Amino acid sequence: MSSDAVDETHENARQEVIAVDADDNEEGLVNRLDAHTGDGVRHRAFTALLFDENDRILLAQRAANKRLWDTHWDGTVASHPVEGQTQVEATEERLEEELGVDPSQYQNLRVTDRFEYKRYYENAGLEWEVCAVLQATLHDTSLEPNPEEVDGLMWVPYERLREHPEYYRQLRLCPWFEIAMRRDEER
């Protein structure tokens, strides 16, 4: 399905993402809506996991206006870098846009993993991403969430969540976050 067959007024119809092969090598740009509808197009993405000094992870509830996985709970932020932008630069930008968190509030933002996945969401579309995982520790937990992006925030003991995800099923976790958490060897 092309973006012509989807609501072209949606903001995603005016954005591009980076199409990649299975090894995360760039293959060009693709319309963001096309990448997330029909059979989709594999593209570059990231999810960032921020922790406090007590090893709690900051989960963010995706806003109800999101096309995919609306109101689901995610790792701290997730998005797509734009052409010419590193994963770290893209993450710094999203942290500031979504949560009002600037680089002076955290340390050691780094890529810790990368994986490919493909998941469909209801009848709304899909994610087919090579997803980088970034992690950092917040030493200043002051937050100013953007209500257009985030409906809620929650600090959760990370090891408890990793070891007993069944305790948190009512949160409806985003699939990319669940994969990143299962694969996490950093903590």
Curated annotation (Swiss-Prot):
Binding site for Mg(2+): 98
Domain Nudix hydrolase positions: 41-178
Domain of life: Archaea
EC number(s) recorded for this UniProt protein: 5.3.3.2
Cofactor note: Binds 1 Mg(2+) ion per subunit. The magnesium ion binds only when substrate is bound. Binds 1 Mn(2+) ion per subunit.
UniProt KW keywords: Cytoplasm, Isomerase, Isoprene biosynthesis, Magnesium, Manganese, Metal-binding
GO terms for cellular component: cytoplasm
Family label: Belongs to the IPP isomerase type 1 family.
Chain's role: Catalyzes the 1,3-allylic rearrangement of the homoallylic substrate isopentenyl (IPP) to its highly electrophilic allylic isomer, dimethylallyl diphosphate (DMAPP).
Protein's name in the database: Isopentenyl-diphosphate Delta-isomerase
Species whose genome carries this gene: Haloarcula marismortui (strain ATCC 43049 / DSM 3752 / JCM 8966 / VKM B-1809)
